[in-house]
Structures are given as structure tokens and as C-alpha cells.
A protein has these predicted regions:
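Acidic, metal-coordinating catalytic segment for phosphate/diphosphate chemistry
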Residues: 1-17, 22-23
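Short small-residue beta-strand/loop micro-motif enriched in glycine and branched aliphatics
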Residues: 4-5, 41-42, 103-106
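Short linear motifs in exposed loops
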Residues: 8-9, 31, 136
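Unchanged
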Residues: 14-17, 48-135
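A glycine-rich, hydrophobic loop/mini-helix early in the fold
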Residues: 15-44
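Short beta-strand-to-turn element immediately C-terminal to the catalytic PLP-Schiff-base lysine
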Residues: 21, 97, 144
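Long hydrophobic alpha-helical segments typical of transmembrane helices together
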Residues: 126-154
Length: 154
């Protein structure tokens, strides 16, 4: 029938992604192989909201520590994005984190990634020039550049 269609929708518990900025104004980026695009990708730290987890902020704090080893003293909420509106329910909550303290990574057994530091402006320009392919990273860097954050933790 005209106007009717069948849709396949991917159900997703949601995710978080963090623009973590050092005192030297460098942003933490992780470099890892992504099977879906068959390539090594440079992106901001991120991760899924675990089943039963209801607070994206707590998930963001956990994921930053697990992936990079860092903890943050100040956190700003940047906003949320729906990266695949045509076929997925996924929402990614974006945060900016500053006043970082280094620690030890706590990666999942199947995770292998390198943590790198890039000057924020260099990372932003890489995203603006199309040199990064990860949508959440591009969006979060653009949002942080415009300082659209609201401080959540003193």
C-alpha cells in the first residue's frame, strides 16, 4: 500500500562520549581498529551505557576512566546526538571534561586502543577539514569549540 513501509530498527541502550581536555589544552583521542568500517579510527573516548545504568553522566565518568585511565574534576554537558536516525534508536550523550588526573586504564578483554593527546585546535581543525570520520567526535569537538557546555560538577 502507498504510504506504508516496513522498518528495521536497531535497539540500543545509548552511549556516552567525552571531549577530555588536559591542562595543556590537549584533547585525549583514542586510536583503535573499528570492524564496521574496516579501518583504524581516531576518536574521542566513548562507550555504551550498560544495561541497568540510568545516568549517562556516571557512564561517562566510568568510560573515561576505563578507556584512558583519567578522571575529571569538571564536567560540562554538551548535548546529545542521534548518529543514525534512519535505522537506530541510539542516543549518544556528549560531555566535555577538564582538570584531568591520570590513572590506569581498565580496558575490556577484547579492547585494544592507544590513547593519544592532540592540541585541541589541531583536533578541531582535523575534524573541520574532514580528516576524521567518526560522527560523535566531529560533533563533540564542534560543540566544545562553541562552548555550549553547562557545568555539572564543581
Amino acid at each position: 500500500k502507498k504510504g506504508e513501509s516496513t522498518r528495521e530498527i536497531v535497539e540500543h541502550n545509548g552511549a556516552v562520549a567525552m571531549v577530555a581536555i588536559t591542562d595543556e589544552n590537549h584533547v585525549l583521542l583514542v586510536k583503535q581498529y573499528r570492524y564496521a568500517c574496516h579501518d583504524v579510527v581516531l576518536e574521542i573516548p566513548a562507550g555504551k551505557i550498560d544495561k541497568g545504568e540510568t545516568d549517562p553522566l556516571k557512564a561517562a565518568v566510568r568510560e573515561l576512566r576505563e578507556e584512558t585511565g583519567y578522571t575529571a574534576e569538571h564536567i560540562h554537558y554538551l548535548g546529545k546526538i542521534n548518529p543514525s536516525v534512519g535505522y537506530s534508536e541510539e542516543v549518544i550523550y556528549l560531555y566535555a571534561m577538564t582538570d584531568l588526573t591520570p590513572g590506569e586504564q581498565d580496558l575490556d578483554e577484547d579492547e585494544a586502543l592507544d590513547v593519544l593527546e592532540y592540541p585541541f585546535e589541531e583536533a578541531y581543525q582535523m575534524a573541520a577539514r574532514g580528516e576524521m570520520i567518526d560522527a560523535k567526535t566531529i560533533a563533540a569537538l564542534m560543540m566544545e569549540k562553541e562552548q555550549l557546555g553547562e557545568e555539572l560538577l564543581p
